[in-house]
Structures are given as structure tokens and as C-alpha cells.
């Protein structure tokens, strides 16, 4: 496609999405590839330049696990959620805030944008409560310092985005007593999207989307509605770490976000392809057919 055709194709989408908020969650597995990360940063800066307000939420699971391994600590997961004792919480805080968040903000600046790093503790952005024990095979398992979102206070996001900044959020929350809690980044992204009344929630991951057959990357479900989610879980199509990712998208759509997308960040400039071209990639979750 010629360059001018690309621009003409993008025009109606730019018009449709102008001045709207897009919450974009980037997974830790994607951030380990520097070239992919650079493409992601370029995409969100382009969105900002054309009048769209991107709000970034990042994970960091692989880097947290790698740091734990170097420190001789084993990572444990239950239903895709990290079991978090106090030592694990401190490691997560160090990796998420000190490493990943700082790097993303730095890269945004390198490419001509204005990033601002935030955790859920800033301005009481993410207020959470401790997640109750989970029933696993008839046994209650305490996840430790793992939180579930109780409240999002989006004022700090609206102020910074309105002044030309791209907010970059780490999923470390605060409870009513001032304690830190580790919250699943997908859950945070979904809750932030609802609180901001975002036009879209976009989850950038390292798979093609929701696969019809989990073992066949060539067969991707292009679209489904929230009402189909439980059936897909029961059939084993959505499982493991994909469950909280897809569930966050489903809950966001149920609570007012127009559309949620799970797209493959390994594709160069995946966000632009999804938002500003007719092609579309990955899986869309929506009540709109």
C-alpha cells in the first residue's frame, strides 16, 4: 500500500478516536524484546500526536520471576496470579517501579513524548483490598499480598493526560491502611479503563489473540461477546494466565468500555494496525457486532 493510501485509510479512524482515551496494557513478556518495545513506544506517541490520549499500564511478570530466581526464591502461581509474600512484594516493587516503569518513561522521552511514571499509591490512584484465599482443589490457598481493586481515583490521570503527558502505571496498589498490594496488571488496566470511561482497552501480549485451539496459533477467534467468556473457559479454550487477561477485558466491556482488544505485540506497530487500518488483528471483545 502506498504511503498516501495508508494516511487516507487512517483518516476516518483518527476522526472517530480524536480526544478519546485508550488504556493500553503491555505485558512483561513483550517488554523483554527491545525492538518490540521501541515499536510500542513509537505507536503510543503517535496516538498522542493525533489527539488520542493513551494511558499505559504495564506488567512485569517475567522480570520479577527472573529477579526472584537470581535471589534464590521460587515463583509460585495460582490461577495465573502470583503468590506474594512480603519478600516477593518488595522484589515486585523494585522491578516494577525502579526498573520497568522508569525504562518506559525514559523511552517515551527518547522518542519525543512526555511520559510520567505512576504507581497505584500516587494520589490514591488504585485502592485495593487483600484478595481472599482461593479455593484450589478443595483447599483454601492464601495468595499473600495480592490485592483486588476496590476503587480507582482517576483525577491524577486526567490532569496529566490533559497536560500532554502519557501516564505509565505500575500495578502496585494501596489499601485503606496504607499498605502496598500487588495487583494483576490486566485487572488494573480494566479497572482504569472503566474509571476513565475509555473508548478502548487494548492488551498487548505475546500471542496472536484468543485461539480457537490453544495449541494452534493459526486459528484465532476474531471476536466474541462477554456472555461467551465462561463457556470458553469451561471448554479449555481460555486457560492459565490468559484467564485474568481475558476476564479483565470482559469485565471492562460489561461495565461500559466500548471494545477490548487482545493483540500480538510481536507484530511491528500492532497498535497502529489495530486502531488506524481496516485490517485489524487479534481478538476483539464487544457487545457490538
Swiss-Prot record:
Subcellular location: Cytoplasm
Residues noted as binding substrate in the record, renumbered to the chain: 60-61, 82, 182
Pathway membership: Amino-acid biosynthesis; L-arginine biosynthesis; N(2)-acetyl-L-ornithine from L-glutamate: step 2/4
Pfam families: AA_kinase (PF00696)
Biological processes annotated in GO: arginine biosynthetic process via ornithine; L-arginine biosynthetic process
Record flagged with keyword Cytoplasm: yes
Tree of life domain: Archaea
Free-text function comment from the UniProt entry: Catalyzes the ATP-dependent phosphorylation of N-acetyl-L-glutamate.
Keyword terms, alphabetized: Amino-acid biosynthesis, Arginine biosynthesis, ATP-binding, Cytoplasm, Kinase, Nucleotide-binding, Transferase
CDD domains cross-referenced by the UniProt entry: AAK_NAGK-C (cd04250)
Native source organism of the sequence: Methanothrix thermoacetophila (strain DSM 6194 / JCM 14653 / NBRC 101360 / PT)
Site (Transition state stabilizer): 25, 245
Record family assignment: Belongs to the acetylglutamate kinase family. ArgB subfamily.
Single GO molecular function: ATP binding
Reaction(s) catalysed by this chain's protein: N-acetyl-L-glutamate + ATP = N-acetyl-L-glutamyl 5-phosphate + ADP
EC number(s) on file: 2.7.2.8
One GO cellular component term noted in the UniProt record for this chain: cytoplasm
Protein name, per record: Acetylglutamate kinase
Enzyme class: transferase
